[in-house]
Amino acid sequence: MINTQTLARPYAKAAFEFASAAGQTDSWSKMLNLAAVAVEVPEVAALLNDPRLTSESKVQALVRVLGDDADEAFRNYVQTLGENDRLSVLPTVWELYEDIKAQAEKTLEAEVETAFELSNAQLQTLAAALSKRLDRTVNLQQVVNPALIGGVLIRAGDVVVDGSVRGKLSQLAESLKS
């Protein structure tokens, strides 16, 4: 079976190229998110997977669900997805679209896990250091996890920096085992 990312990638790229050219990347992000959420609703998913319905009727049903939140260009995009039997990959299209958008805007969502809550000044300092290291604007989301004991664990895209006491203790335990 073909990977959904393989199916969704060209649609995500096309959506981003169109939205970028029209200066509507944020509104397309919202519309794609809405459509992605809609196709995951069990009732809508059942309707879209019903083999008795034509692709046109499936598209019309999804467009009705989206209502006025989808502009004409987006409805045409949904029509294209429907004609190619790709409505079910909308959640993956949205995820890939967001990745492409973040790359184009040179932004990166990062999670910083700490044992204790950091102050705004500490978060800003950390975000600035990460932005410099990764050459991107970093948006930090803080998660407090007392199990870390101390230090920080940072996840930014493919980069993971484990500066936690728990991580250091795990490394020490591994080195003692060998």
UniProtKB/Swiss-Prot annotation:
Cell location: Cell inner membrane
Gene Ontology MF term list: proton-transporting ATP synthase activity, rotational mechanism
One Pfam family, short name: OSCP
UniProt keyword list: ATP synthesis, Cell inner membrane, Cell membrane, CF(1), Hydrogen ion transport, Ion transport, Membrane, Transport
GO cellular component: plasma membrane; proton-transporting ATP synthase complex
Presence of keyword Cell membrane: yes
Bilayer topology annotation: Peripheral membrane protein
Signal peptide from the UniProt entry: none
SUPFAM superfamilies assigned to the protein according to its UniProt record, in alphabetical order: N-terminal domain of the delta subunit of the F1F0-ATP synthase (SSF47928)
Gene3D superfamilies: N-terminal domain of the delta subunit of the F1F0-ATP synthase
Database matches in InterPro entries: ATP_synth_OSCP/delta_N_sf (IPR026015), ATPase_OSCP/d_CS (IPR020781), ATPase_OSCP/dsu (IPR000711)
Chain's role: F(1)F(0) ATP synthase produces ATP from ADP in the presence of a proton or sodium gradient. F-type ATPases consist of two structural domains, F(1) containing the extramembraneous catalytic core and F(0) containing the membrane proton channel, linked together by a central stalk and a peripheral stalk. During catalysis, ATP synthesis in the catalytic domain of F(1) is coupled via a rotary mechanism of the central stalk subunits to proton translocation. This protein is part of the stalk that links CF(0) to CF(1). It either transmits conformational changes from CF(0) to CF(1) or is implicated in proton conduction.
Subunit and interaction comment: F-type ATPases have 2 components, F(1) - the catalytic core - and F(0) - the membrane proton channel. F(1) has five subunits: alpha(3), beta(3), gamma(1), delta(1), epsilon(1). F(0) has three main subunits: a(1), b(2) and c(10-14). The alpha and beta chains form an alternating ring which encloses part of the gamma chain. F(1) is attached to F(0) by a central stalk formed by the gamma and epsilon chains, while a peripheral stalk is formed by the delta and b chains.
Family: Belongs to the ATPase delta chain family.
NCBIfam families cross-referenced by the UniProt entry: ATP_synt_delta, PRK05758.2-2
HAMAP family: ATP_synth_delta_bact (MF_01416)
Name of the protein described by the UniProt record: ATP synthase subunit delta
Organism: Stutzerimonas stutzeri (strain A1501)
Lineage: Bacteria, Pseudomonadati, Pseudomonadota, Gammaproteobacteria, Pseudomonadales
